[in-house]
Amino acid sequence: LGEAIGDAFLPVLKFQHRDVIDLFLPLETGFHNLAIVSSKNRYPRQGRKTALGLLGAGQMMFLKTIVAVNPEHDTKDLDLLLDALDSKVEISEDLVILPGMVADSLAHASPWENIHDKLLIDATSPIEGDPRYLRAPLGGCPDSLEVSASGIDGIVQARMLRSSMLVVTTDIEGGPSPSENVETDDEEGARRQREKICSIRDSIWNLEGASNLRWLFITDSDVDLSDDSWKRVLLWQFFCRFDVGRDLHFDSDRRRVCWDATAPIPSQGGPLPVRRWPGVTLHDPEVLARVDTWLQEGGL
């Protein structure tokens, strides 16, 4: 329903924002955590201008992350999105962070209610007149990096998404359960979580062949990277669990980014606070069983 509403109102949005070619807000990201916009690209950085305009467009002001892509890009093809992030995004140049902006009240990962940082990713092709126009093609990593990363202590699974993009899963001791709300702070658990993420990040970045690993995603092991649904689950984890100001970690040259998408443990003692963390589903198993029985009896 949400995606249908987005398609229905797209003509109105394009009339108000003439640079917009297409727009997609994926269901898996709750509609307010990610937008993919294809923009006209007639002059340098037009995609960024388009994205910034949308961040001031009514309820789109609640967006956490917006990715600008080329005019011909199919915004609903998530494989094409990975291709664009891999081949067109230089971390030091093409990630724009807007600190202290308006957040959705349902953005539970934000450090303060209704306030968070926003992320604009420019995945458009540089055109003539842009200093990036003549830059060399962005390099990647050897396939063997996936095997090397799998052997690091604390990593459950590892998978290369693209040549510059690796996702790993891990178990966080005391991390929030998908079935329960976490209402109280756990300073020691949050400290262990931060230390584990830093340890995994540094271990991977120090691997041979990891110099061009521009994107490192770390998430919980409740996603199976060998399952058919892994892409859809990752999309939710990557964009709903992280906070731009708290969970993006850059290397010293700002050429690589580590994206922490593990479920945050509530605390006040870190660089930025973590608020209460809601369960993903709170349905009583007995109630679910009764509903299933009722549906079966009704032939539904």
Where are the model-predicted features located?
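Charged, compositionally biased interaction regions
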Residues: 1-300
